[in-house]
Each structure stands twice: as structure tokens, then as C-alpha cells.
Amino acid sequence: MDSERFLRELPELFENFPHSEHPVDRRFAPIVERVENLARENNLALLNLAASCLGPDEIYVEVGVFHGASLVAAMLENEGRFVGIDSFDFRDGSLETVEQNLAHFGVGQPELLMGDVFELVPAGALGQARAGVWYYDALHTYEGQIEGLRIAEPWLAPGAFLIVDDTDWEQVARAMDDYLADQPRATRVLTIDGKDRGFPQWWEGMQVLEWSA
């Protein structure tokens, strides 16, 4: 993961980062308009940039796919191995809907794993791969949040990013703080407030952690 490039180029995607209502490049607007989602163009631009910074042997893992908006955005004009994991029990989420949205935007076919991440990953669903990005947007209870990061640790490449959504939520923010206090290999490199703190253009906030070697 080229973390230096990510942190250098992220502000360049916007006229006034993080205050801009949307990125300069509006290619993510059709995704937000077509696909039911819980994100904004800004969130999608961040994920797309992160995916573009992966190392040659690293994979992108998304936990919590819903209708596929963020996965489509991450894959847009990026190559590599992408993995989406979801039990599809949130609202009307379904594997079929995700596949339809992937096909509509022509981004190729990721590996879509249907089931509980806390069962699939320990059972070897990722094989010997190393994740350069672990994007967690699933169970946002305090315990679920911490475990959603811990479960990734054996598969993280040196310098990998752990990206977490909805960090405005009190239990998520607290879980992030406690995880960092307990895990010296993880460092918070970016915090972006969301609508609860005056930045609705970032939905409900994001944080990025970097995993050291």
C-alpha cells in the first residue's frame, strides 16, 4: 500500500478538502444516483484512491457490501483482486442486486463471499492473500467494530489501510480508540467527520488506520 501517495493525493481530489461538497471529478455521481447506498461521492472517491494505491500482490477487501455502491466505486478504473463479504441480511441487500450494479457500471467481477465474515475469514476464505485495504462497513456495535478489525490482522500486508465508515457513531468512535490503545501496530492517519459533526458531504464520517510491519 502506497500510503504516502494516498495521503498526498487525497486533498488534490477536492477544491477544498475536506469541506468540498463533492470531488472535482464527478465520475462517482452516477453511482450515488443509481445505487441505494449509505455514502456520498466524497467517501467513494476516497475508497477509489485507496484501491489505486494497492501494491502489486495486495487485495482489496470490503466487509459490508449492501447494494455494491462502494465496491463499484473502488473498482472503477482500478485493476487487481477485489473481495466483497456480506451476509446480505441488512434491509433488502442481495447478491443479485450487487451483481446487477457491477454489470451496469462494467467494473468486472470481484469475488463475492456470502456469509458471516467472522466465520468465512478464519476458515480461510481469503487464502494466502494479503490485504492492502480492509474496508469495514458492517456490524457497528462496539464489539462488532473491534472484532471487525482484529479479524483482519493475520491477512494485513505491511502498510495496509484499515478504513472504517460511520465513525461519527459514539460506539464506533469508542471502539476505534480502544482498538488503537490495545494494538500498537495500528496508527490512525486520517479522521474525517461526518454529518453529525457538520460535514454531511462525508455521510457519517470515516477513519483510516495504517498497519505497520
Please provide the spans of the model-predicted regions:
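A short alpha-helical cap/connector motif
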Residues: 1-213
